[in-house]
């Protein structure tokens, strides 16, 4: 009998070259694992039964590679993809590591840096499309400030808008089948990063030349750093038709960007996130933007990757149990099952409905006195999660 918690292609689980390829380096310590080549990472992901691999341009092709070196590296990568069946659903540009981007890429005060960032991104888009990417993520890790004396925030937003407009026109001119997904983060590595939350980007997108081409890529850790409910951000993006991609990991609220294995820390919120994605039928990739503990060797990295996918499927199973639990569903149905006899029906605005509502005698005390049984509902939810229901 097959394991119901083993990944299958329809689950669309993906990892980045930079995630499973992380050698365990951090700001306070040197690498603890050997660096894996992109080809080795593709074979590792095939071994753990992932669906796809994502990459920054320089995860695959070094920033100073010659054209001949670039072609050789990409050729070897394509061969590994063909051998394993691993897909490339998403790509992105590294606009944060090189010293040229120390004051931002698209929002840099230096027009030469802004122009270079556009050129680098166009080449990276070409590479991503060549390898099959249909989503292109933008994370502006350096698009911010340490001191507000250094930049005009309105001018910075204008520069960012102009860059995205340029790139959407480029994609259309090339006739690429590609959409953009913008990823928010409040801080780190900059003291403050512009457009710090998913909600910020949802507003910003509507100011672009081609908003239909641009959505968001919410990340658990980044919203938790702001102390926000991640599932609510995802729901807002879904409601707006802008949930083009998602980054799954875990994070203690208010900490530095921890990139913990998905579902390993915030158990209840991870459950409601998976439940939401499955309830609405989110069709996109489930991308794990997280890292194995620095204590691990390469075998531990495989455990991390397998654990990420298995945990998602465990939460998915719990969501099914929650939906099928009779007592839970009775409580949920009862929330809206209240007598409304005689109350004006509320729908689209009409003058008659407005007058009827203003004239209706609501029993305010009865409304306030009604118990909602949320304690019982939450307790039953915990019992599902803890495996006793």
For each predicted feature, which ranges?
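Short acidic/polar active-site loop segments enriched in Thr and Asp
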Residues: 51, 134, 244, 283-284
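Residue-level preference for long, well-ordered alpha-helices that form the structural scaffold
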Residues: 30-37, 66-73, 110-114, 149-160, ...
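Alpha-helix-loop-beta-strand connector modules within alpha/beta enzyme cores
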Residues: 67-93, 157-174, 202-210, 268-280
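N-terminal pre-domain/capping segments
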Residues: 1-135, 165, 210-211, 217, ...
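Short acidic, glycine/proline-rich loop/turn micro-motifs
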Residues: 25-28, 101-104, 148-151, 256-260, ...
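Active-site/pore-lining binding-face segments in mid-to-C-terminal subdomains
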Residues: 249, 257-329
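Acidic/histidine-rich catalytic cores of soluble enzymes
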Residues: 8-15, 147-269, 367-389
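Active-site-proximal loop/turn and secondary-structure-junction residues that shape catalytic pockets
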Residues: 19-21, 57-59, 92-97, 140-144, ...
């Amino acid at each position: 009998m097959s394991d119901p918690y083993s990944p299958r292609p329809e689950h669309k689980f993906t990892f980045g070259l930079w995630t499973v390829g992380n050698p365990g380096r951090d700001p306070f310590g040197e690498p603890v694992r050997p660096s894996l080549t992109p080809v080795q990472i593709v074979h590792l992901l095939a071994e753990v039964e992932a669906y796809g691999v994502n990459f920054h341009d320089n995860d695959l092709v070094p920033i100073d590679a010659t054209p001949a070196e670039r072609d050789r590296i990409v050729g070897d990568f394509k061969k590994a993809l063909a051998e394993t069946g691993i897909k490339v659903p998403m790509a992105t540009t590294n606009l944060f590591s090189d010293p040229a981007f120390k004051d931002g890429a698209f929002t840099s005060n230096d027009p030469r840096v802004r122009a270079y960032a556009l050129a680098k991104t166009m080449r990276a888009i070409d590479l991503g499309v060549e390898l099959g990417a249909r989503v292109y993520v933008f994370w502006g890790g350096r698009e911010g400030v340490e001191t507000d004396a250094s930049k005009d925030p309105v001018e910075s937003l204008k520069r960012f808008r102009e860059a995205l407009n340029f790139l959407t026109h480029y994609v259309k001119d090339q006739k690429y089948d590609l959409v953009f997904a913008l990823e928010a983060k409040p801080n780190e590595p900059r003291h403050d990063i512009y457009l710090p939350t998913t909600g910020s980007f949802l507003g910003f997108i509507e100011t672009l030349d081609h908003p239909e081409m641009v959505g968001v890529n919410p990340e658990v850790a980044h919203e938790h750093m702001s102390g926000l409910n991640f599932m609510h951000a995802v729901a807002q993006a879904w409601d707006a038709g802008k949930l083009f991609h998602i980054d799954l990991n875990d994070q203690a609220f208010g900490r530095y960007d921890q990139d913990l294995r998905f579902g390993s820390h915030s158990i209840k919120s991870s459950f409601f996130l998976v439940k939401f994605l499955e309830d609405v039928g989110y069709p996109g990739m489930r991308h794990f933007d997280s890292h194995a503990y620095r204590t691990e060797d390469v075998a531990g990295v495989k455990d991390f990757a397998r654990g990420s996918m298995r945990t998602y499927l465990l939460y998915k199973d719990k969501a099914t149990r929650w939906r099928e639990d009779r007592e839970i569903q009775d409580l949920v149905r009862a929330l809206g099952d209240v007598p409304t006899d005689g109350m004006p029906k509320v729908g689209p605005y009409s003058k008659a409905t407005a007058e009827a509502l203003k004239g209706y005698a609501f029993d305010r005390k009865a409304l306030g006195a009604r118990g909602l049984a949320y304690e019982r509902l939450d307790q039953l939810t915990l019992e599902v999660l803890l495996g006793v229901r």
